[in-house]
């Protein structure tokens, strides 16, 4: 089934809304909590781990719930409508900075972060499941994901450029108030984007949903070796992404000695590279095996990251920007491939086991994603504290070395592991065509 451009844009609008939050979490939240809200790096690390673990446990349950519930609007689309407004409100609350005692401020951070991640789960799992029901054509799925990830990078533009600028303009010297207002506007925009996604997309297929218990579904899911590979891959990717992305603001401000004014252009460089990567992937995968591209781009990311550590000094501003651009370009080329591969792995599991486990599979992938984010957040907080980071002061040589390591070599190891692991992933275009044929014969 061919999708119209309007529907592809509408589908992408949903992920644009999601990425207002996820980009803020990856690029700004650690910096916001330490340098603006005033939490210690160690407390931020523990916060990230605890909240992500809570959220990760809930993800599979949400996946099962989406499979059980069906409405006249479909199985997955209604969640976008129901949770659009709560999503926008939760974004706003997460960036409020009440003037309270330290422990009360920490409790507020826990409460609002947990609320945000729960709402995020309730809307994200149905959204990522939609790609399996709006079309069964793998080429159209990849194309829709191409639109989707270009729009995620537009969201990244807004978070890395517009939010800091609005924070200065709206805050009038009060950065905390500025971030509250600017992220409140992003939350409102996200709510509208979810409603637009709901209105412009359609669920066209009704996959067979199992009536088995969650425990039995889980046993079948664990027999899906390709799904397990994808789960470990997204965990490793998120470790690399979150560590590098979260420390980028510190790298620009302290290591490159650019202060607050360099944060926005440095982060934006990575966003531009990511947008170009989405466009390049859509073109390259027409001529080259998408799984090979996935694997090799992660190995290239490892090499570039290692070179950046040994080549870029504190005075090499242009070289730092160039390496950051290239790392983000090659690293992000895998995104459309990964997220279109989940639906294909679900089909693979159905062919292998005879049972289709969809909602739990998508929820499980988000479990791995958030587990990786939690691990990365813990590593980030621990290392910032270990290397002696202190907010808004001149950093020691030790803390600067730590920031440089978190920007380059440490995430590089995770990307190398992904590149090696993807050699075990089997479902390329030809393999998936055979899966579709086998499933079609089964249903005939």
Residue ranges and their predicted role:
Residues 1-444:
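Membrane-embedded alpha-helical bundles of multi-pass transporters/translocases
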């Amino acid at each position: 089934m061919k999708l119209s451009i309007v529907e592809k844009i509408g589908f992408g609008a949903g992920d644009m809304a999601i990425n207002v939050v996820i980009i803020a979490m990856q690029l700004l939240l650690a910096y916001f909590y330490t340098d603006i809200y005033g939490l210690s790096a160690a407390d931020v690390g523990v916060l990230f781990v605890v909240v992500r673990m809570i959220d990760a446990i809930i993800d599979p349950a949400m996946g099962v719930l989406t499979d059980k519930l069906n409405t006249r609007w479909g199985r997955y689309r209604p969640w976008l409508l129901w949770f659009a407004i709560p999503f926008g409100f939760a974004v706003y609350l997460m960036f409020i900075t009440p003037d309270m005692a330290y422990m009360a401020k920490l409790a507020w951070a826990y409460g609002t972060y947990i609320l945000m991640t729960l709402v995020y789960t309730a809307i994200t799992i149905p959204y990522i499941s939609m790609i399996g029901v709006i079309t069964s054509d793998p080429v159209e799925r990849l194309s829709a994901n191409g639109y989707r990830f270009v729009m995620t990078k537009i969201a990244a533009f807004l978070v890395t450029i517009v939010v800091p600028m609005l924070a200065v303009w709206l805050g009038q010297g009060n950065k905390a108030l500025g971030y509250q207002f600017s992220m409140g506007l992003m939350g409102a925009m996200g709510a509208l984007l979810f409603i637009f996604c709901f209105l412009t997309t359609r669920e066209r297929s009704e996959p067979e949903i199992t009536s088995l218990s969650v425990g039995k579904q889980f046993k079948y899911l664990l027999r899906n070796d390709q799904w397990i590979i994808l789960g470990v891959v997204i965990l490793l990717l998120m470790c690399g992404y979150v560590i590098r992305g979260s420390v980028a603001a510190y790298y620009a401000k302290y290591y490159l000695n650019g202060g607050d004014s360099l944060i926005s252009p440095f982060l934006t460089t990575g966003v531009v590279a990511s947008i170009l990567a989405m466009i390049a992937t859509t073109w390259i995968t027409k001529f080259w095996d998408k799984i090979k591209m996935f694997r090799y781009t992660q190995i290239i990311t490892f090499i570039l990251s290692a070179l950046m550590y040994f080549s870029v000094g504190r005075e090499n501003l242009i070289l730092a920007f160039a390496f950051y651009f290239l790392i983000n370009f090659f690293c992000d080329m895998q995104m459309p491939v990964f997220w279109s591969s989940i639906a294909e792995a679900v089909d693979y599991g159905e062919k292998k086991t005879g049972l289709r486990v969809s909602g739990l599979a998508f929820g499980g992938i988000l479990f791995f994603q958030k587990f990786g984010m939690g691990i990365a957040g813990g590593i980030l907080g621990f290392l910032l504290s270990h290397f002696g980071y202190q907010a808004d002061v001149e950093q020691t040589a030790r803390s600067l070395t730590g920031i440089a390591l978190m920007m380059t070599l440490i995430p590089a190891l995770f990307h190398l592991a992904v590149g090696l692991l993807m050699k075990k992933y089997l479902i390329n275009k030809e393999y998936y065509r055979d899966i579709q044929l086998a499933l079609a014969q089964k249903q005939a």
